[in-house]
């Protein structure tokens, strides 16, 4: 079974070909460098870039692969930026019509979950910590068609909090990889920020932690005290990761699952990956090349859904 996977939910244009869930081709063009100066994604510009990039990727794939041999076309339907999702939808329909292949709409978050299935076998039921710029969720997955959210952020997503803290500390965009790099090189003591508490046993709240960090920074400025930006950034990451891990452990104690999965763009965070694997011997993390948005995870999700039928 050969599946073309198309991902355009945010600022990465990515197309992959998977054959029996093995990656045959993966081409991705990121827009991150374009939006560094803006400190975030601008949807209108992103949509225009997707139009340009999706055609560039198509040219690359056509030179190397016979698209007529594809069995299915899968694309990200939701959630994401409306305009960028539309680009992927129109492209998927064009390929479907050109080659007379069935089209499969995929939920972006389910796609992230199945990024782990490319290199690992996922046993059900599974507990997933999904962490990204737009989402922070704990999900119970009984099969490819049965996803249950048992906890989620009530305000900022963890990736959004990283971006906002990074912006306030004038470190740049995107905040996740910048702060993670600082953390890996930091050897000092951590500031003891308070781990958040949210209503609901498995929910998250990152606005309070973000405010703690920003207030600490502002107070230092107002008192004209020395500021160690690296200490503040590293301490924020330490607290954020601890919070994610502790909430996951709490859910794992209640739910009898056969696999524990880390997914989403923030799964690229080095400390989160390390601590997640330490939780349990059933823990699975995605290969770094599948951690952020990519077409392979969309095709992999479609493959799992088709297998289940």
Swiss-Prot record:
Q: Which UniProt keywords apply?
A: Acyltransferase, Cytoplasm, Iron, Metal-binding, Transferase, tRNA processing
From the Swiss-Prot or TrEMBL record, state where the protein is found: Cytoplasm
Which biological process terms from the Gene Ontology are attached to this UniProt entry? Answer: tRNA threonylcarbamoyladenosine modification
SUPFAM superfamilies per the UniProt record, alphabetical: Actin-like ATPase domain (SSF53067)
What Pfam families does the record point to? Answer: TsaD (PF00814)
**What cofactor does this chain's UniProt record say it requires?**
Fe(2+)
Gene Ontology molecular-function annotations:
iron ion binding; N(6)-L-threonylcarbamoyladenine synthase activity
* InterPro entries in alphabetical order: ATPase_NBD, Gcp-like_dom, KAE1/TsaD, TsaD
Which residues take part in binding Fe cation? 108, 112, 293
Q: Which residues form a coiled coil?
A: none
State the source organism's domain of life. Answer: Bacteria
Is this entry keyworded Transferase?
yes
Reactions catalysed: L-threonylcarbamoyladenylate + adenosine(37) in tRNA = N(6)-L-threonylcarbamoyladenosine(37) in tRNA + AMP + H(+)
Family of the protein in this entry: Belongs to the KAE1 / TsaD family.
Q: Would you tell me the protein name for this molecule? A: tRNA N6-adenosine threonylcarbamoyltransferase
């Amino acid at each position: 079974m050969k599946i073309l996977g198309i991902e355009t939910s945010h600022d990465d244009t990515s197309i992959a070909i998977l054959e029996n869930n093995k990656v045959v081709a993966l081409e991705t063009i990121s827009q991150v460098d374009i939006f560094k100066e803006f400190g975030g994604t601008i949807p209108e510009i992103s949509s225009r870039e997707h139009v340009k990039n999706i055609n560039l990727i198509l040219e690359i794939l056509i030179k190397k692969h016979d698209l007529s041999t594809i069995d299915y076309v899968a694309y990200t339907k939701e959630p994401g930026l409306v305009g960028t999702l539309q680009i992927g939808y129109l492209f998927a329909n064009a390929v479907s019509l050109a080659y007379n292949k069935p089209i499969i709409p995929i939920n972006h978050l389910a796609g992230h979950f199945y990024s782990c299935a490319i290199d690992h076998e996922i046993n059900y039921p599974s507990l997933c910590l999904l962490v990204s710029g737009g989402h922070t969720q704990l999900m119970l997955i009984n099969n490819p068609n049965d996803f249950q959210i048992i906890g989620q952020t009530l305000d900022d997503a963890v990736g959004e909090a990283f971006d906002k803290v990074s912006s306030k500390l004038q470190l740049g965009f995107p905040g996740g990889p910048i702060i993670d790099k600082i953390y890996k090189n930091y050897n000092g003591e951590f500031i003891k920020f308070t781990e958040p508490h949210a209503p609901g046993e498995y929910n998250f709240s990152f606005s309070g932690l973000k405010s703690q960090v920003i207030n600490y920074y502002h107070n230092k400025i107002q008192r004209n005290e020395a500021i160690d930006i690296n200490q503040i950034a590293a301490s924020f990451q330490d607290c954020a990761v601890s919070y994610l891990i502790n909430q996951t452990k709490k859910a794992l104690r209640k739910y009898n699952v056969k696999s524990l999965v880390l997914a989403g763009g923030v799964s690229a965070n080095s400390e989160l990956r390390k601590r997640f694997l330490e939780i349990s011997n059933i823990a699975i993390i995605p290969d770094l090349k599948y951690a952020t948005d990519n077409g392979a995870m969309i095709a992999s999700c479609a493959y799992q859904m088709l297998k289940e039928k």
